[in-house]
Regions:
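Cell-wall polysaccharide-cleaving catalytic domain and substrate-binding groove, primarily
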Residues: 1-143
Length: 143
């Protein structure tokens, strides 16, 4: 998809800019061509698969690691080594409609969708996906 002026997360169907690991995601493109084109980040076959992976990661943060607030979640998602984490936290908390230290329930599809959308906007400099794409990814993650 697109040219290099298109944000990387959009080109890769990876709205959260999730790093590739040794374990492939459902819907991830592990073809030689995809890996040659993108060495660091996951490339997904569809944007829905990218939103599913983003939401699954956030759910893991809450369920496995006990991260309950936007501040805790974004602190892990976007550590200060590469990011202005404080600004990221404030932007996402505002978009979700909570304070940075307020507990959020990611088993609620509306809250999870708002958080995933806010991260996608921040990572890509805008929102490039419609609400149906986000909702489909969130629904898959919550199954």
């Amino acid at each position: 998809m697109g040219t290099t002026s298109t944000p990387r997360g959009v080109r890769n169907n990876n709205p959260g800019n999730i790093d590739r690991t040794s374990t492939p995601w459902q819907g991830e493109d592990r073809s030689v061509a995809a890996i040659a084109r993108e060495q660091r980040f996951c490339v997904f076959l569809t944007p829905q698969a990218g939103f599913r992976a983003l939401a699954k990661t956030l759910l893991t943060y809450q369920r496995k690691h006990g991260l309950r607030t936007v501040k805790e979640i974004i602190g892990r998602w976007a550590p200060p080594v590469e990011n202005d984490t404080g600004a990221y936290v404030r932007q996402v908390a505002t978009a979700v409609g909570v304070s940075p230290s307020e507990v959020v329930r990611l088993d609620n599809p509306v809250t999870l969708g708002r958080l995933a959308t806010a991260i996608a906007k921040h990572e890509n400099g805008g929102m490039y996906w419609n609400a149906d794409v986000v909702a489909a990814g969130i629904a898959e993650a919550l199954k």
